[in-house]
């Protein structure tokens, strides 16, 4: 019997954040029938979609926020999300990640503190860069320190490339192809993987050995290249010296989700170099459907790759342990 599922890369837009992302990105969302409405809604329609996907608890987060929302917009967006969850007919089916003004690390730390301490959020899901800038500098230590103090994870989530980054994906094909290559078709996934490696190389995990980072989409390319990156990190002077090698940081500081990756092939790779305790189910709703996620999980059940106990770990137990939540096992 398929275990209940806990999904934690599941998206939403508050009015404050939707208004901040710019007309271009609003039009992009509205170009997919029903997508904008699904992102703006936390009502019964979302609960029904969760039921169809056997999801007992959904951790809601704002989707990508290109352009970088202000601290005021993030505060309003988090307040709106908390209020909407409280008004749902079954609020125990939901938890939340905070949206943060990532261009301002000090303001991000303050909003993370407020969202966790006052609103009961279980961490933050943030854009992978702020106008092309990753968060490996010492100016972001204030954010990592706050996450460690609160003992909550930070989910590094792909976002659209900056204008400068986007130029690298244009070529001898129509502009929409370049846009796709720079985004979900390829580019924003390895950019998250690169960010994690930069955090390691910059000593962030040395300064904050209890930092908890989540990456989605089967590890954002990292599992496939982990052995080579680990080897390169120690050669020709290395990326350090570091207190712990990359493989140890991978085992102790990184969690990955299955979001939007409906094939067993990448999971087979992951199981060769990643502890099952660090793998968590997710969908990427509403960009992906809960039903498709359930189909994939049933395929995983029948594959024999995991024991019954391990299936439950991926389905919900690992996320419960990381987020310190306890979902209802029966809907």
From Swiss-Prot:
Q: Name one GO biological process term.
A: secondary metabolic process
Enzymatic class: lyase
Q: Reply yes or no: does the keyword Zinc apply.
A: yes
For the keyword Ribonucleoprotein, the answer is no
Question: Which positions does UniProt annotate for Zn(2+) binding?
Answer: 11, 157, 284
GO cellular component, alphabetical, reads: cytoplasm; cytosol
Enzyme Commission (EC) number:
4.1.1.-
Inactivation phenotype: Fails to produce F9775 A and B, but accumulates gerfelin and continues to yield orsellinic acid.
Arranged from A to Z, the UniProt key words for this protein are: Decarboxylase, Lyase, Metal-binding, Zinc
Recount the UniProt induction comment for this entry.
Expression is induced by an intimate physical interaction of the fungal mycelia with the bacterium Streptomyces hygroscopicus. Expression is repressed by VeA and MvlA via histone 3 acetylation by the SAGA/ADA complex.
Known InterPro entries for this protein? ACMSD, Amidohydro-rel, Metal_Hydrolase
According to its UniProt record, in which pathway does this protein act? Secondary metabolite biosynthesis
Q: Name one GO molecular function term.
A: carboxy-lyase activity
Q: Which Pfam families match?
A: Amidohydro_2
Role description: Decarboxylase; part of the gene cluster that mediates the biosynthesis of orsellinic acid, as well as of the cathepsin K inhibitors F9775 A and F9775 B. The non-reducing polyketide synthase orsA produces orsellinic acid by condensing acetyl-CoA with 3 malonyl-CoA units. Further modifications by the decarboxylase orsB and the tyrosinase-like protein orsC lead to the production of F9775 A and F9775 B. The functions of orsD and orsE remain unclear since only orsB and orsC are required to convert orsellinic acid into F9775 A and F9775 B.
Q: Which family does it belong to?
A: Belongs to the metallo-dependent hydrolases superfamily. ACMSD family.
This protein is called: Decarboxylase orsB
Q: Which organism is it from?
A: Emericella nidulans (strain FGSC A4 / ATCC 38163 / CBS 112.46 / NRRL 194 / M139) (Aspergillus nidulans)
